[in-house]
């Protein structure tokens, strides 16, 4: 087996990735597969931090358009990410992987409050640390949270798991001739207006020199291939 090229990663999972073909909620089989793929990385001595979105359970921006206060909607979205985090922690524990769930705000009795030094300590002990509740502030996406936590824990890369094989020049679902990029610079992504993540998250990563790798988590074994340096997905640096 190839050696990992990253020592510490921040894995960003979208909430939608957890729902599978269900269209809503959490597909237990997908959750269990992801837990086993993360377990593989731990066995390779890779330190893993995880940020999960909440779009499979709740979308604050949609309700904001319907008249709900955006702050309230975003708070509800943050709680959805905590629910996903609880599910992921449970799946990891069932796979015999030590995992810790941290929330950006206090939720006594449910999970720990985010603490930077504690997170670093646990990562060094090869425990998976799941960061939930986004950044803890409204108006910021979970992509922003992933880049922020990645920078804070000094990860080597932010791995953005999606439903497509990487970054394309146009939507591959609408255009079968869409071209997949293997490598891009931050400037190219902005110039070509490619949809990698929202601009606030992307510029945060760019300003701190945090590489982003976009890949398809739907492909079994793709996470391991990304971490061992196979030409999987798109790298942005």
Curated annotation (Swiss-Prot):
<dbReference type="GO" id="GO:0006225">
    <property type="term" value="P:UDP biosynthetic process"/>
</dbReference>
<keyword id="KW-0547">Nucleotide-binding</keyword>
<feature type="binding site">
    <location>
        <position position="74"/>
    </location>
    <ligand>
        <name>UMP</name>
    </ligand>
</feature>
<keyword id="KW-0808">Transferase</keyword>
<dbReference type="InterPro" id="IPR001048">
    <property type="entry name" value="Asp/Glu/Uridylate_kinase"/>
</dbReference>
<dbReference type="GO" id="GO:0044210">
    <property type="term" value="P:'de novo' CTP biosynthetic process"/>
</dbReference>
<dbReference type="InterPro" id="IPR011817">
    <property type="entry name" value="Uridylate_kinase"/>
</dbReference>
<keyword id="KW-0418">Kinase</keyword>
<dbReference type="GO" id="GO:0033862">
    <property type="term" value="F:UMP kinase activity"/>
</dbReference>
<dbReference type="InterPro" id="IPR036393">
    <property type="entry name" value="AceGlu_kinase-like_sf"/>
</dbReference>
<keyword id="KW-0963">Cytoplasm</keyword>
<feature type="binding site">
    <location>
        <position position="171"/>
    </location>
    <ligand>
        <name>ATP</name>
    </ligand>
</feature>
<comment type="subunit">
    <text>Homohexamer.</text>
</comment>
<dbReference type="InterPro" id="IPR015963">
    <property type="entry name" value="Uridylate_kinase_bac"/>
</dbReference>
<feature type="region of interest" description="Involved in allosteric activation by GTP">
    <location>
        <begin position="20"/>
        <end position="25"/>
    </location>
</feature>
<comment type="function">
    <text>Catalyzes the reversible phosphorylation of UMP to UDP.</text>
</comment>
<feature type="binding site">
    <location>
        <position position="55"/>
    </location>
    <ligand>
        <name>ATP</name>
    </ligand>
</feature>
<feature type="binding site">
    <location>
        <position position="168"/>
    </location>
    <ligand>
        <name>ATP</name>
    </ligand>
</feature>
<keyword id="KW-0067">ATP-binding</keyword>
<feature type="binding site">
    <location>
        <begin position="135"/>
        <end position="142"/>
    </location>
    <ligand>
        <name>UMP</name>
    </ligand>
</feature>
<feature type="binding site">
    <location>
        <position position="162"/>
    </location>
    <ligand>
        <name>ATP</name>
    </ligand>
</feature>
<dbReference type="GO" id="GO:0005524">
    <property type="term" value="F:ATP binding"/>
</dbReference>
<comment type="pathway">
    <text>Pyrimidine metabolism; CTP biosynthesis via de novo pathway; UDP from UMP (UMPK route): step 1/1.</text>
</comment>
<comment type="similarity">
    <text>Belongs to the UMP kinase family.</text>
</comment>
<dbReference type="Pfam" id="PF00696">
    <property type="entry name" value="AA_kinase"/>
</dbReference>
<feature type="binding site">
    <location>
        <position position="59"/>
    </location>
    <ligand>
        <name>ATP</name>
    </ligand>
</feature>
<feature type="binding site">
    <location>
        <position position="54"/>
    </location>
    <ligand>
        <name>UMP</name>
    </ligand>
</feature>
<protein>
    <recommendedName>
        <fullName>Uridylate kinase</fullName>
        <ecNumber>2.7.4.22</ecNumber>
    </recommendedName>
</protein>
<keyword id="KW-0021">Allosteric enzyme</keyword>
<dbReference type="GO" id="GO:0005829">
    <property type="term" value="C:cytosol"/>
</dbReference>
<keyword id="KW-0665">Pyrimidine biosynthesis</keyword>
<feature type="binding site">
    <location>
        <begin position="12"/>
        <end position="15"/>
    </location>
    <ligand>
        <name>ATP</name>
    </ligand>
</feature>
């Amino acid at each position: 087996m190839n050696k990992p090229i990253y020592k510490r990663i921040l894995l960003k999972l979208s909430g939608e990735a957890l729902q599978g073909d269900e269209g809503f909620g959490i597909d237990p089989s997908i959750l269990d597969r992801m837990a086993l793929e993360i377990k593989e990385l731990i066995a390779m001595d890779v330190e893993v931090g995880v940020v999960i979105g909440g779009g499979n359970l709740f979308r604050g921006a949609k309700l904001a358009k319907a008249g709900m206060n955006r702050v309230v909607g975003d708070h509800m979205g943050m709680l959805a990410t905590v629910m996903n985090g609880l599910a992921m922690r449970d799946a990891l524990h069932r796979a015999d992987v030590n995992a810790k769930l941290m929330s950006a705000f206090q939720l006594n009795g449910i999970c720990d409050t985010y603490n930077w030094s504690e997170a670093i300590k646990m990562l060094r002990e090869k425990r998976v640390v799941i960061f939930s509740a986004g950044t803890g502030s409204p108006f910021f996406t979970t992509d922003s949270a992933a880049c922020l936590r990645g920078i804070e824990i000094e990860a080597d890369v932010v791995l953005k798991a999606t439903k497509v094989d990487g970054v394309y020049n146009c939507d591959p679902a609408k255009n079968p001739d869409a071209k997949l990029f293997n490598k891009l610079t931050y400037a190219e992504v902005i110039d070509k207006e490619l949809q990698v993540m929202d601009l606030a998250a992307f510029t945060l990563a760019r300003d701190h020199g945090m590489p982003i790798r976009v890949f398809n988590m739907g492909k079994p074994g793709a996470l391991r291939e990304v971490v061992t340096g196979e030409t999987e997905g798109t790298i942005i640096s």
